[in-house]
Regions:
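Glycine-rich phosphate/cofactor-binding loops in nucleotide/flavin-utilizing enzymes
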Residues: 266-314
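C-terminal helix-coil-helix/basic helical segment that borders enzyme active sites and/or dimer interfaces
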Residues: 217-248, 258-269
Length: 314
């Protein structure tokens, strides 16, 4: 709802396009509020599209009264459970047109539409509850009015509202907090499911908790600052801070989980307690496209040293 709601309201559209967007998103919102519909957002395809460097290979070819969608999404969270798949695809007027990022379309594909299939298993290191199986679109007809954003507006959003790609960070900020909270309760002997034994009196435990608290507060500080700056047309400094916040949250969540396991000791890694899951889930955060940890580092280094349009050609 962020992309089709507040974010879309900040972007440029002519009056006709904006009115149509208001009408179509009202349909989606009514489904969610009145019918309890679940919308998923399949994104990755196994190539460079999710990183924002090429057009999505999933296509939506214009047809009478709608589009015909063809393609595949991997790591499709809620595959088989969602009612609609908010699918990023490339709109084409004809099947042989050259795909362009500027023609990206954000389309709600009904899960029960003919040609939608869910295949494969889901047995990863972490994020097991997302059930992110592979989603296939085989000549799927999607009617007009299914747009979540008007054609081309996603491309504008990616260029002008880059904080839109930080929407996974709250979950990992929560994991970071959970790792710290687990440690405090465990050392105080107050954790449900663990022996009521206090371990807080040991200096090594106190120092470890202090280190964890410092890392948690530093991570929160940059994250809240970046979130407060989310909006259209951010400055270069704000974009660099967004990359830094994304990197810090995703990496520090796992670092805190590691410290929690080391500090609490062997019992804390039992599957009957939450810390084992927090550790596995948090390790996956730095892999999340389009702003993986590696991409954030690459962009921070380059954009700090180069102004737009600069190069080293003689």
């Amino acid at each position: 709802c962020l992309w089709s709601g507040a974010l879309a309201d900040d972007l440029e559209m002519d009056g006709v396009v904006r009115q149509r967007h208001h009408d179509t998103r009202a349909v989606h919102y009514r489904r969610i509020l009145d019918d309890g519909a679940i919308y998923a957002q399949p994104f990755s395809e196994g190539g460079s599209a999710a990183a924002g460097t090429v057009a999505f290979s999933t296509t939506a070819v214009r047809s009478d009264g709608g589009w015909v969608v063809r393609g595949k999404k991997i790591f499709a969270s809620l595959a088989g459970s969602a009612d609609y798949y908010g699918t990023l695809c490339t709109e084409l007027q004809h099947a042989d047109d050259k795909p362009s990022r500027s023609n990206t379309l954000y389309l709600a594909v009904p899960a029960k539409a003919e040609g939608v299939r869910v295949v494969g298993d889901w047995d990863p290191l972490g994020m097991r509850a997302t059930v992110s199986r592979t989603l296939l679109f085989e000549e799927v007809f999607v009617p007009d009015g299914s747009e979540l954003l008007p054609p081309g507006v996603y491309f504008q959003a990616a260029s002008r509202w880059p904080h839109m790609f930080m929407t996974l960070t709250p979950a990992y900020m929560g994991l970071a907090q959970a790792a710290y909270d687990f440690t405090v309760k465990y050392l105080r002997g107050e954790l449900p499911g663990a022996p009521p034994v206090k371990r807080r009196m040991y200096p090594t435990k106190q120092l470890a908790v202090a280190d964890m608290r410092l890392m948690l507060e530093q991570t929160k500080a940059i994250w809240f600052q970046a979130m407060s700056e989310a909006g259209p047309n951010p400055t270069k400094e704000q974009i660099l801070r967004a990359y830094a916040a994304q990197y810090s949250v995703m990496e520090n969540a796992n670092e805190l989980a590691q410290l929690a396991i080391r500090t609490c000791g062997g019992l804390s890694m039992l599957k009957s307690l939450a810390l084992e899951r927090i550790y596995r889930d948090s390790r996956c955060g730095s892999l999340m496209l389009p702003w993986t940890a590696e991409i954030c580092l690459d962009r921070i280094g380059r954009e700090a040293l180069y102004e737009s349009g600069e190069n080293d050609d003689a």
